[in-house]
């Protein structure tokens, strides 16, 4: 199954399960959880079901395309359902069957692995899903986002698209994956990966990154004061990416790291609080009356 067909099939499956099918969010982020369709919608009383593919950037993970299964840019497929439905594990296994992976023919294990994002003030309990010894999915019942308790509890299912594609296509390297019948993953992303790694590790200007972080932090604070939740979150995500770029350059001390994380977490918490306040003023419109 081609890479693009995996996304299309997951869209079809989760659409039939009642999920909105959304598009990626248009700013750099380290995980699909940072998309407002997850980070904001996971909190508050309103029900929410959404699925989407999300490109993610983690600058420190770059290897100039030399590592067969590690890159600074990759794709997740994100599913959020709130409240979490019964038999969600069975639905997930059925989604694998929809991709051509019969659970009866493979060793599929749910390995306990609780999840945490310090910068988002988010955590949850759940499992890694292993398929014949390779992790392919993270399964998490969110407990908090932005430091706010989740009630009702949402389920997050995060598929690692490259790993699933490697399994389906029997490939040893993400760079050999077939995006479609004519174009490989490397034809699209290898030059991008090399360029971005050069920037991440050698050519970004740390002093400018520090200045940008301060500017983005100031902008986020200003927007939070005005209860402009969405643009405020945009600037929190920009702060997070600046921090990740500084980390990739190796210019952050242990003390600085803790301070940067706390600054981002504080902003994320205030954005989440602002979101709840906005939705409450709207009488939580998605709650069924």
UniProtKB/Swiss-Prot annotation:
Q: What is its EC number?
A: 6.1.1.14
Claim: Cell inner membrane is one of the keywords in the record: no
Record flagged with keyword Ligase: yes
- Protein keywords: Aminoacyl-tRNA synthetase, ATP-binding, Cytoplasm, Ligase, Nucleotide-binding, Protein biosynthesis
- What GO terms are given for molecular function? ATP binding; glycine-tRNA ligase activity
Which HAMAP family has this protein been placed in? Answer: Gly_tRNA_synth_alpha (MF_00254)
Q: What is this protein called?
A: Glycine--tRNA ligase alpha subunit
Q: Which organism is it from?
A: Prochlorococcus marinus subsp. pastoris (strain CCMP1986 / NIES-2087 / MED4)
